[in-house]
Amino acid sequence: MNAVPAPSADVRAGIGWRDPHHEALLTRRPGLGFVEVHSENFFAAGGAARAVLRAGREAYDVSLHGVGLALGSAHGLDGHHLEQLARLVDDIEPVRVSDHAAFARGAAPGGGVWHASDLLPSPFTRESLDVMARHVQAVQERLRRPIAVENLSAYLRWRDHDMDEATFLNELARRTGCGLLVDINNLWVNALNDQRQGRLDDPDHAVRAWLDAIAPHAVAEIHLAGHTDTGDWVIDDHGSAVAAPVWALYRHAIGRCGSVPTLIEWDTDLPPLDTLLDEAARADAAMHSADGVPA
């Protein structure tokens, strides 16, 4: 087993670049590792949104996180979407670019393209892996850089798989040279829902086994977020503080991978900036403490 990389003081957690906090982030300049934006929100070449993002880029590293590449769609990539992303990448020069291991597009009955307007899970099959690898390679060639691909919070399951999710993502990274974006809250949400559907007994053990299986050298970024328990389902809604079990799983992850750029994802019911900074500081403490336990 490879030794865990030593903690690096240069690796720090980041938060989302969201409208209510732009002014304070530019004025206060807290010590963040990066800020994250949703790529598609900034595809328009001009206007105030892009201008404010450029100002943010002068103050912080920017991570572009997308939801629209549909890397697993057998119908193919949307060339227009990719070109818009490429222009944004050229303008902003982000520190990372990422999207999801998901599909969203297909051939519509009678012609045209059907779009789900959501992230749907790709089956973990050899055929699906071939499709996604081909698309990841095409995106990386156009952007002239590697991207990171995120594991999905999935509320439906395909009946048949050739492999498990960690094996699928490891092979995707091996074939394409892409990085992996490990969303620990997504893993926890999936495990809780699988437990409620009778597919597993111990969610914590399942997530730890997933993290143990993933290739540590491929992990380019980690996401932490909150979720909502509706009673029947657990929903990955990014609307609350990171839950205690997710923090424990994060400590397990960095115990294997070392210090990895980590995003505190909070997109709904946005709290005061200081709350986000406190969450980011907790992630920093976990990464840089000798035992990996947050202060």
Name these PLM-found stretches:
Residues 1-87, 295:
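N-terminal pre-domain/capping segments
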Residues 11-17, 33-37, 62-65, 95-99, ...:
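Hydrophobic faces of well-ordered beta-strands that scaffold small-molecule active sites
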Residues 18-20, 38-42, 67-70, 100-102, ...:
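Active-site beta-loop-alpha junctions enriched in small/polar residues
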Residues 24-30, 46-64, 80-95, 137-142, ...:
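Acidic (Asp/Glu)-rich catalytic clusters
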Residues 44-46, 76, 120-129, 190-257:
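Gly/Pro-rich active-site loop or hairpin
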Residues 78-180:
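Active-site acidic/histidine proton-transfer and metal-coordination neighborhood
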Residues 140-233:
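Acidic/histidine-rich catalytic cores of soluble enzymes
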Residues 273-294:
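C-terminal helical cap(s) of enzyme catalytic domains, especially alpha/beta-barrels
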